[in-house]
Structures are given as C-alpha cells and as structure tokens.
Amino acid sequence: MTSASRTRPLADAGTYVVQVAAALLTLAPFALSVLTSLKAPVQFASTSPLSLPNPVTVENYLTLFDGSRVDFGSALGLTAAMVVVVLAGQLVFSIMAAYAFARLEFPGRDLLFWVYLATLMVPPVVTVVPLYLMMVQLGLRNTFSGLVLPYLLGSPYAVFLLREFFRGIPSELTDAARIDGAGTWRTLLHIVVPLSRPVIATLAIITVVTHANNFLWPLIITSGDELQVLTTATASLQGRFNANWTLVTAATTVAMLPLMAVFLAFSRRIVDSIQITGFR
C-alpha cells in the first residue's frame, strides 16, 4: 500500500468531520430557537438556554396567532401577498429587459446595460430616503402599493442573470422562429422563456427569500399593525413586551420554516444560479 493510498482515508475522514462540524454550527441557532420557543417564560428565565424544555409547551405559538399581542396571522398573509406580487413583477419586467439587452439591437444598448448594472454598487440604504420621499409625494405611505412598488420593475441582478443566460441560447433557434414568422413577443414567450425555466426558477427562489426577509423598507414605509410583515412583526415583539424571548423565538421559527422549506426543496437551483453567474 502506497503512502498516498494510506493518507486518502484520513483525508476523507477529516473532510467529513469538517463538514459535520460546519453543519452543526449552521443548525445550532435554529435548534436553539426551536427549543427556546417550546419553553415557558419562567423556565427560560430560570434555566440554562441550552436546557431542554420541561415541560414542552406550545403556548408561545398559540399566543402568536390569537391576536392578543400581535396579529401574526395577518403579518404572515401580508408577507405572502407581498412576495407574490413582487415576484410576478420582477419576473415579468426582468425577463423583458434582459431579452432586450441580450437579443435586440438598438443604439447604446451595451452602454445602457452597464450603467444599469453599475447600480448594483450603490448600497440600498443610500436610496431609502429618496424612495421614501417619492412614496410620500405619491400618497403611498402606509399602503400596500408603497410596500411593493419600489421592487416591481426588476432588479439589476435579475436582469444580469437572465441576460447572460439568454445570450447562451443558440441564435439559430430564434432565427428559425423569425423565419417561420414569429415576432419578438412570440419568440420570447415560446422559445426563450421555455428554454430558460431553470434560471427563471432560480431567480424566483432568490426573490422569494430576499423579499420575505426584507426588514428596512417595510419598517420605514409602514406604521401601525395593519401592514406589518413577518420581519417587522417579529421585531415589534422585542420592544413591546420587554423582550419575551420565548415568544420572539416562536415568531422567528414560524418565519423561518417556509423559507427553509423553499431552500431545501430547490437548493440545487440556487447552486445552479451561482454556477451560471460564474461561468457565463
């Protein structure tokens, strides 16, 4: 047996140990949140945070949805509605813009694209105040329209990702469609979009996760309890009730579960998006 063959099992074992340790470190905060949410406030205050709940109680989850402290059910529904509307707008407008930048010929196309892409370097906090003033002048403060409007018309990252994928589609396919009499819209809808379903699915997942976790804009543009989303509703529990951590962790657990389900179901698509962005 050569030295290389002897060290291979040790290297594999070391890699496995590192991966297990990384997985445990990643899951530890979520596990601690779940355990804390199943404790009564008295038990949490009198025992170690790492102790198991004894007895197990779901009172914190019942409190979330009974409306006595915060209308978490409405926040959950509003978050879902916000994500669906933003997702639809982002996909529609990003696909159209990306196709124009990838396939259509017009003066200044590449310059306009790179100028648009350069806005990725602008931190989001820089545009918050101008966006807020625009929404106030339009009378959209503390409305659902004001909550979703700034994100409806696509994003530079989405346009970039789709444009790079569209450019990789063989031009022979779109040329053949035009020869058969298909116009721009028909070529886009019947040729390009069906071939781009993997990257569109990836973009949809990223959009859902990003906007379900959006905190700063909902906090600024809305007030009161009527238009609270999951992030702002969870944050309000900390100051309003002197940081009842068992209730807060129950809220964070409920907020995380849908996103974790989406990530676990479509994690391969998320990895594919990174590969597509890197190789194209």
Language model features with spans:
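Short, Lys/Arg-rich, polar N-terminal cytosolic tail immediately upstream
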Residues: 1-9
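A structural signal for multi-pass alpha-helical bundles of membrane permease subunits
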Residues: 12-280
